């Protein structure tokens, strides 16, 4: 499973670890992803989404039906 938020599209980015001597070694910054079940009242069922913490805040703000409508227009499976 790819490390991509289904709501916000957040994905891993690359950067550097920096030691005290400012030596750089490559690293990845991973999104804070969770598999979470959301109850969809209109469909009377649970939907499991892989969302970041910010994605959960977006769902709290907009509502799950609105977010699922956006996913459908993008052609994403859920």
Swiss-Prot record:
GO terms for cellular component: cytosolic large ribosomal subunit. GO terms for biological process: translation. One of its GO terms (molecular function) is structural constituent of ribosome. InterPro entries: Ribosomal_bL28, Ribosomal_bL28/bL31-like_sf, Ribosomal_bL28_bact-type, Ribosomal_bL28_sf. Residues 1-21 are annotated as: Disordered. Keywords: Ribonucleoprotein, Ribosomal protein. The keyword DNA damage does not apply. Signal peptide: none annotated. Belongs to the bacterial ribosomal protein bL28 family. HAMAP family: Ribosomal_bL28. NCBIfam families: L28. This is Large ribosomal subunit protein bL28. It comes from Serratia proteamaculans (strain 568). The gene is rpmB.
């Amino acid at each position: 499973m790819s490390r991509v938020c289904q709501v916000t599209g957040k994905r891993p980015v690359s950067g550097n670890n920096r030691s005290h001597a400012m030596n750089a070694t490559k690293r990845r910054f991973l999104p804070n992803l969770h598999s979470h079940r959301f109850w969809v009242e209109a469909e009377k069922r649970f939907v499991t989404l892989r969302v970041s913490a910010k994605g959960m805040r977006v769902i709290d703000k907009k509502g799950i039906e609105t977010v699922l409508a956006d996913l459908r227009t993008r052609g994403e499976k859920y």
